[in-house]
Regions:
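Short amphipathic alpha-helical heptad-repeat segments
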Residues: 8-15, 35-48
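Charged, amphipathic alpha-helical oligomerization/scaffolding segments
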Residues: 14, 21, 42, 68-71, ...
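Charged, low-complexity interaction regions
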Residues: 27-34, 53-63
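Amphipathic alpha-helical binding modules
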Residues: 62-92
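A structural signal for well-ordered alpha-helices, especially hydrophobic packing surfaces
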Residues: 19, 23-26, 47-51, 73, ...
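Alpha-helical and His/Cys-centered functional microenvironments
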Residues: 10, 17, 52, 71, ...
Length: 92
């Protein structure tokens, strides 16, 4: 069985990877709302805070944060998929 730390660390890594994807899109000229990047940064901070104080949180808290992170990742991936046309047009 996974520990609370392992679950949150995995969620943190997935969210961090998502932020890197967002930044890569900006490097090729896709303009994203600053709020999107700010939101992911804030979620990373909150997940790290929870990791740093893991003994103060119940499993239900960990799972809520994990689910929130996963939902944000899915929404951002959808946003990025919708930007593919702009990316391929930019590369031509």
């Amino acid at each position: 069985m996974w520990s609370k730390e392992q679950v949150l660390a995995g969620s943190y890594q997935e969210l961090s990877d998502c932020l890197m994807d967002l930044l890569k899109y900006e490097m090729v000229g896709i303009i994203l709302d600053d709020c999107t990047i700010g939101l992911v940064n804030k979620m990373l901070e909150n997940t790290q805070l929870m990791l740093d104080n893991i003994d103060e949180f119940e499993w239900s808290d960990v799972m809520k944060v994990r689910q929130s992170n996963y939902t944000a990742i899915r929404l951002i991936n959808t946003l990025l998929i919708n930007q593919y046309d702009k990316i391929f047009t930019h590369k031509r």
